[in-house]
Amino acid sequence: ILSGSFGARLFSNIRSKQGLAYDVQGGVGFQWDYPGMAVLSMSTKTETTGAGIESLIREARDMVKNPPTDEEVEKAKSARLNSFVFSVDSPSKVLGKYLTYEYFGYSSDWLSKFKKGIEQVTTEQVREAARKHLRPEDFSILVVGPRKGTASALARYESVQELDITIPEPS
């Protein structure tokens, strides 16, 4: 609903309508070590960093204020199931998935359970998940870019921690 297709909310509003990003994504993360972590991300020009952050936050709030429709949920389910096919379209990809599942302790029938689980998701479950988990007041914001162009955009946030991620020259 937030991303994954050209009609998704983030893509439609932030990329198409506002022109703030070429790449914008979001959803509930499916990381093995942090399952369920909500992530919104975009690539934008330095000078539109502030507007981009505000747009991402606004879209998160809008998922609660204007919850997904039945049509949005069905489209999202279909897109997820259809895209999943490409992650298992070769023997090496299937083997890789099974090895990953084994490593993280998932059952051998996890793939079929996953598919059935997606098919059974209801609009009300999506709405409840948005209400429960998309809380911009709890967001951590990560900006990668030059301080010169992003400092003023970040000044409005309570605590900004600067990290030097410079890659040293090889010696």
Residue positions per predicted region:
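Short phosphate-engaging motifs
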Residues: F6, T48-T49, G149-T150
